[in-house]
Amino acid sequence: MTQASSTSPEPSRRQPDSGIVLYDTMQRQKVPFVPSVPGRVGMYLCGPTVYSDAHLGHAKKEVAFDVIRRTLLHFGYQVRYVTNVTDVGHLQDDSDDGEDKIARRAALERLEPMEVADKYFWSFVEDMEALNVLKPSINPRATGHIPEQIALIEELIERGHAYVSDGSVYFDVRSWPEYGKLSGRRLDELEEGTREAVREEKRDPRDFALWKRAEPGHLMRWASPWGEGFPGWHIECSAMSLKYLGEGFDIHGGGLDLEFPHHEAEIAQAEAAGHPFARYWLHNNMVTVGGEKMSKSKGNFTTLKALFAQHDPMVIRFLLVSSHYRSITEFSDAAFESARSGYRRLTEALHEIERRLPAAPDQDDPALLEKIAGHIRTFEDAMRDDFNTPRAVAALFGLTTDVNAALNAGEVGRQALTAARDAYRTLGGGVLGLFAEGRTEREDDSQIVNALMELVLQARQHYRLQKQYAQADELRNTLAAVGVTVEDTREGPRWRR
């Protein structure tokens, strides 16, 4: 099942020798990115647990890795992008106790668990489409891959890294000394921080569930060699990433809050079973509200649907790409106002270029063309440097400043305007995803709009010359009501949106 979202941008025809460096959590430093197969990238992202509507924290993760994927496409790589859907096994306290989050929501809403999963999955798809997030290559669900998870658990038991206890199966942490290498936690430190209340069926409090016995009345249950039950939260990602990307795939991504225990467990499950796992680990930082992490458990979140009622989704996306994926994004009215202003500046520049293009003269503008090329180089260098979107956005603003200055100074040639337009579309649209398909006018539509606006401005100018100011003001106010601003300049009236 795949998300219904925007069409993937065409990968560049250049040879993918991009010079990208990225921050690898495992190595705790920036390292050159070298895919295992030249020109191809396998990428896995931990997706949503579909038991309620998504909030801005979820959007940050999805947009961050969408931009990383788009950047790889821009530099010529073919990308297989897999992101899972957790629709079973994620318990209330993110460990091995409590109710399944989806089963609990099903009881609250008086629905079947799969009705809840479908309802919130499609809600998530709708939100991602609004944010112009590209659909995954593959979007596997945990409940659709129970046999693969059981098979991986059996491998771990056979190799002595898992044990059966009263119908449940646990990973034996002591059998795998490398456990903790991603997060940098030592086993003795983990033992000190473990809760005193430990399930009696565990040999060690640090062990985690691979398969859970289904208690009487539990709604989600499958047959297994150990009796009826359901998979633990961590096993699905190991099983599904290996199935669709193979051993030693290139990039595994997710939120910083998943580094431990989820990603740590994923590595242990795969490698203890003899399967080399992800080669690079990338983690996005959180969204905060008043300095605290935005989360459902804290109750300090606002759903994306509620935000969409107040803000253009593209303004929200602009807010998210304006900070680095490894930096904290603060949720505030001031941040949204700044994002709205910045995004409007870019879109107005693009619209003005599209407005001027049909009548642009065939003249050379070598100085402006060189400036445009310089901004493109700056943008691409920023994205090569661990996907530095703040610097990339700054390059777009630099492009905007130079193009606006040239337009204000007089006529700009068709070649320079075309180069500027293509830079906005390729970099701002294709890489950062800020100009969703269908949200900026096609060239033929733009020409029609421009011609109609010229007629309206001529009519308004006629009223002004005849000193019929009430009629002229009425036209201006009518245009303002639909988001069009008219400015009276020395060169005559101009309009913008």
Swiss-Prot record:
Reactions this protein catalyses: tRNA(Cys) + L-cysteine + ATP = L-cysteinyl-tRNA(Cys) + AMP + diphosphate
An example molecular function term from Gene Ontology annotations: zinc ion binding
Cofactor or coenzyme needed: Zn(2+)
Key words, A-Z: Aminoacyl-tRNA synthetase, ATP-binding, Cytoplasm, Ligase, Metal-binding, Nucleotide-binding, Protein biosynthesis, Zinc
A Pfam entry, by short name: DALR_2
Domain of life: Bacteria
GO cellular component assignments: cytosol
Record-level GO BP terms: cysteinyl-tRNA aminoacylation
Identification of the protein by name: Cysteine--tRNA ligase
Organism: Deinococcus geothermalis (strain DSM 11300 / CIP 105573 / AG-3a)
